[in-house]
Curated annotation (Swiss-Prot):
PROSITE patterns xref list: RIBONUCLEASE_PH
Enzyme Commission number(s) from the entry: 2.7.7.56
Protein's name according to its UniProt entry: Ribonuclease PH
CDD domains in UniProt: RNase_PH_bact (cd11362)
UniProt keyword annotation of Lipid metabolism present: no
Subunit record text: Homohexameric ring arranged as a trimer of dimers.
Organism: Rhizorhabdus wittichii (strain DSM 6014 / CCUG 31198 / JCM 15750 / NBRC 105917 / EY 4224 / RW1)
Record GO terms (molecular function): 3'-5'-RNA exonuclease activity; tRNA binding; tRNA nucleotidyltransferase activity
Matches recorded under PANTHER family: EXOSOME COMPLEX COMPONENT, EXOSOME COMPLEX COMPONENT RRP41
HAMAP family: RNase_PH
InterPro entries, A to Z: ExoRNase_PH_dom1, ExoRNase_PH_dom2, ExoRNase_PH_dom2_sf, PNPase/RNase_PH_dom_sf, Ribosomal_Su5_D2-typ_SF, RNase_PH, RNase_PH_bac-type, RNase_PH_CS
Record-level GO BP terms: rRNA catabolic process; rRNA processing; tRNA processing
Keywords, alphabetical: Nucleotidyltransferase, RNA-binding, rRNA processing, Transferase, tRNA processing, tRNA-binding
Function: Phosphorolytic 3'-5' exoribonuclease that plays an important role in tRNA 3'-end maturation. Removes nucleotide residues following the 3'-CCA terminus of tRNAs; can also add nucleotides to the ends of RNA molecules by using nucleoside diphosphates as substrates, but this may not be physiologically important. Probably plays a role in initiation of 16S rRNA degradation (leading to ribosome degradation) during starvation.
Length: 238
């Protein structure tokens, strides 16, 4: 039995609220259970130096947690003067995942920055950030299309992410903090709605696992991402 009482293949409740802020071209508050992340997409009419003059765009991401997003207060990384390795790893993952579904040539020479701020953490903050990031990106691109700034839709597919793990010997979907802390294997999958895999991260802690267990985790991830894709479509009216 999972601590939450959920079935092995049961997601936490998903909520996606769009238009959560007034200034960003795209914004959402996404919740996976008690994990809540504010995600904004900001359009900038510039690109990184390595892309200047090449006629194509870029999508990048930044990630951070509010000091009391967790059980005990954590210091702001800005106050420390540098980002942690974990933060850098997660924001690179978010950026890679979203770039996997964008045709940069159709975006034109502009950049979209996805900012992910964790308001409350109960496991799965990176997967919620990616899943909400796609919605914010979709909203921002829709504004570019509506204004005539771009002629063609650069988004090629939906992308979503979910965590899975082996808890007390059972593969389970969408780990919360308690499960994640006690799982002897955990994985994060980033999937496209066409079935392709953008990223797969799976690690063992204390005990290894076999190939069949990995495939069972992937099958669970497909179930979870299917639910997220449906929530994304509902949020964006597509």
């Amino acid at each position: 039995m999972r601590p939450s009482g959920r079935a092995p293949d049961q997601m936490r409740a998903i909520s996606i609220e769009t238009g959560f802020t007034v200034h960003a071209e795209g914004s959402v508050l996404i919740s996976f259970g008690d994990t809540r992340v504010l995600v904004t997409a900001s359009v900038e009419e510039k690109v990184p130096p390595f892309l200047r003059g090449k006629g194509q765009g870029w999508v990048t991401a930044e990630y951070g947690m509010l000091p009391r997003a967790t059980h005990t207060r954590g210091s702001r990384e800005a106050a420390k003067g540098k980002q942690s390795g974990r933060t850098q790893e997660i924001q690179r993952l978010i950026g890679r995942s979203l770039r996997a579904v964008v045709d940069m040539a159709k975006l034109g020479e502009r950049q979209i920055v996805i900012d992910c701020d964790v308001l409350q953490a109960d496991g799965g903050t990176r997967t919620a950030s990616i899943s909400g990031g796609w919605v914010a990106l979709r909203l921002a691109v829709d504004k570019l299309l509506a204004s005539g700034a771009i002629a063609e839709d650069p988004i090629t597919a939906q992308v979503a992410a979910i965590s899975c793990g082996i808890h007390e010997g059972t593969p389970v979907l969408d780990l919360d903090y308690i499960e994640d802390s006690n799982a002897h294997a955990d994985a994060n999958f980033v999937l496209l709605d066409n079935g392709n895999i953008a990223e797969a991260q799976a690690t063992a802690e204390g005990a290894t696992y076999d190939e069949e267990a990995l495939l069972r985790l992937l099958r669970l991830a497909r179930i979870g991402c299917g639910e997220i894709f449906a929530a994304q479509r509902k949020a964006t009216g597509r």
